[in-house]
Structure formats: structure tokens, C-alpha cells
Amino acid sequence: MYFQVSLPHVPEGAFGMMLIQLFVAMVEDCVNESVYYPAHLAGMEVDIGASASYSGFVLSLEGLSDKLGEVALSYFKTMTSLKIDADRFEKRKEERLRDVHNLCLNPARHAKRALEVLLKQKDATQEDKANALQEMTAADLQAFADGIWQHAHVESLMIGNLTKDEACDVGERIRACLPGAPIPDNSWPETRIARVPQGAHLFSIKAINADETNNVVLYYFQLGESTWRGRAFIILMQSLMHEKLFDQLRTKETLGYSVSCSFDSTHEILGYRVSVESAFHPPHFVSSRMAAFLRSFPEILDNMDDASYEKTRQSVVDDILADDVNLREEAIRHWAHLVNQKYQFHRGRHVAQIISEISKREAADWCREFIQPFAPGSRHVSVHIHAKNHPVPANGSEHALGMGDAHFDISAELKNVWGLLPQQGCATAVEELIMPDSSSGTIHRAVARTGQNLDADTESTQDKSLSLRSQWAADLAEMRSECGASCACRRAKTGPVFVLPTPKK
């Protein structure tokens, strides 16, 4: 069982982020002996944590017991009636403060956190979080716990050995213990990231650990809103580049011990990352070698023999369409589409089909257009973590971020200048998505409200085609409600329980 709780009354900024994290910690503290430990002895796994957007939390329960619903209900009852013990609060606050200070001691993690602070609409530096924690009192957290349930929205995935009636019963009992009302349409929490302008944007940051010897250079290329075609290219590019990147920069040039590339989809905005960690070379030299490799990679693809390209492409398709190994893997796959609130349970199938049709030349041209550092058309962010042997330049074109030193934190200012990309996904689209009318107008409206924007500028001509709309109509028709007319989930302001589609990914 998985539950995602959205709470619009979480305050903005670092103080609100720490409130939700300490709230979760105090819930864990309260249920540890009475609920968590007995559940653990019974073979159940329970985890609760703040959501990635800090606008709620996620509760997950796994196990073979038929008491999972009772455990979930116990957690929700505790959360909606939480009383803060001052002594336990101070203990948990101290633990969290230590975690905040230690999180970015690793330079690679430091670089990732710096990028998140730059991009995410709702994020803050570790220093801001630490300051917020130090100012927080037990009374602040109690007021927060009493006020956040004015409006709430809970989405759940229940999968495994339970019937629809049992699932509806769990949902109804949890709904009954929620004291507030549904979230108004104009109050939904937003999860957006900054729109990186065209060009290169460099940020130099001093390592937090004064004795650190490893430098890190992290490249990030923003590609725009997530589409099937965009995901297909970026997933294929990762597989094509990974081995050659490691061979060139790690094996041949011995640039650094850790060399990697990966695709990114923070809040359903596509990006591509390349990272190198080096103890021997200054960040500007590491960056120059990374840029040289990326500039040469389209030509490497052009010269790649057809058999090798076909083999790599087919392996990517096979991996996407592979059967789930167990129920947990299947649940995680479905849950990802609920968390991003796009509900595109068939997305992997469409992405795999597009990958199978991408030619070697198309892959090389795509790389030339999007994954080229310092090119005018690319949207490129470069984060440099400077260790003690290679300090941050006193003068230069780089921005200096307040992430462990005394420099001015310009992340909030930059996000105001850069602007934000549109919100992706919509939780209120569930009912239309699951129960579409036969009319094409309703189907098109359901598609638009679930984030597959057929009229967006980022969509290609192929994605706008009538055949895609027809395919969406077929997909939507497969998602049918199983609830009876008298089911509690049919009441006003609620959505139906439904059976997840059978096609893989």
C-alpha cells in the first residue's frame, strides 16, 4: 500500500521544509513502540517520509499480513491527532540538524544538492535549513500539526492480495479520520522548476569539508517538458554514451575516479547530467575535457557501426519492456505514475516503440542540438565543487553560491530572473482519466489535463498527430473502474478505485 498526502498549508521556504520533516520524525517517534515495532516483527515494512516537493508526505507499507490496512489507519490517526512532546522534539531536532549539516560533506552529493537548490521552486540551502531548525520550537511544530489538515488530498495505490471491497474499506476508514476538507482548485501545491535560459551558466562552490581533496564538476542540460519522444532520446543517449564516456575520461585520460552520465526528470522536466569527480585536476580543466568529449560524441555516433548501434538500441527496448520480477517492482512502476500525477501507465510501451524507430543519424543530430556545452542553443548549467587544493577563483565569470561559504546565495534571485516551467501533472484529472466518455472531446480533455499536452510547443509534429490521440483513446478505454454504484468511493469529491492496466510499463 502506498499513500501520497498533499497538504497546501505547508509554509513556504526552509522553515516549512523543516516543519514537514520534523512532523514526519515525530510521527515515527510516536508510533515506534505501539505500531512500527509490532508490524516489523510481523514481517511488514513501513516507511514514511516528506515528499520530494515538501508539500506533504508519502507513506508506504509492504508485507504478507492482512493487517496492512490497520497499520496504515494507525499512522493516519496518529498524524491527525499528533501531540508534540517537548523533550522528544529536542532530540529529534538535534538528529535532524546533524543530518542537515552532514548531507553535503560528500562533494558529489554537494553538487547535486546545489543543482536542486538552483532549479526547484521549493528548495533551500542547507544553511537556511539549519537556521530554520535552530529557530524552531515545539510550539511551532504543534501549531503546524494542528493546522495542516484544514485541506488535504490523499492518493493511494493498493496492489496485491486484497479485493476491491477491502481496498474501498481501507480508503473509507482513512477518509473518515481526516478532519479537514478537500483541497480547493486554486490551492493545489505546485511542483515546478526553473527554466534555464539558453547558454552556459557556471557556478563555483567551496567544498563544505575544509579537508576535502576531491573536486566535482556536474553538467546539467535542460531539455524541457517530458514527452514520450524526449524520454526516448534521452534514455537511448544514456546507454549509448555511458561506456564511451567512462572509457575516454576515466580509463584513457584518468581524469577522475568517478565518471557518469544519467538522465534526469525532476518534476517531469527532462534533463541530462554528466559528472566527474577528480582529486588531481582543477574543476576548470576537468570541465574542458568533459566539454571536449561531448563535442566529439556526435561524430563518435556517426562512426559507430550499425550492428553495435542496433544491439544497444534493442537492449534498451528489451529492458523497458521486461516483465516485472516481483510485485514490489510492479507496484513501484505504477506508483511512479501516480506520484508525478500524469497517470501515464502505458508510457514505457510508447517510449520503447519510439526508441526502436530512432536511427543512428537522428541520435547524433539530437546530441548536437541538446547535449553541447556552451552552445548558444543549449540550456546548460555547470556546477563546480572546489576542494582545498583548488580554491574558488577570486575573479571570473562564475557565480558563487552560498553553499558552505560566506558568498551571497543567488539561487532565489536567479529563479526570479529565469522564471519557472509550467506545472506538470494534475491530481484532479484522475476521474476523467479513468472514466472517459466515448466522445473524442472528453478524451482530448482528459489527455490535456494529465500533462500530455498535445498543443505544447515542445511536442513534435509526430506527437501531435491524430494517431497519437487515437492511441491515447485506446489506452484510456483500458482503464476501467471496478467500483459498484454504491461504493463509498463514488461519493462527491472523491475518485474511483480502479484496476491498473495490464500492459508492461
Regions found by a protein language model. Give the residues of each.
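Short, conserved charged micro-motifs
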Residues: 12-14, 68-70, 164-169, 228-231, ...
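A short linear hydrophobic-aromatic micro-motif
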Residues: 44-46, 256-262
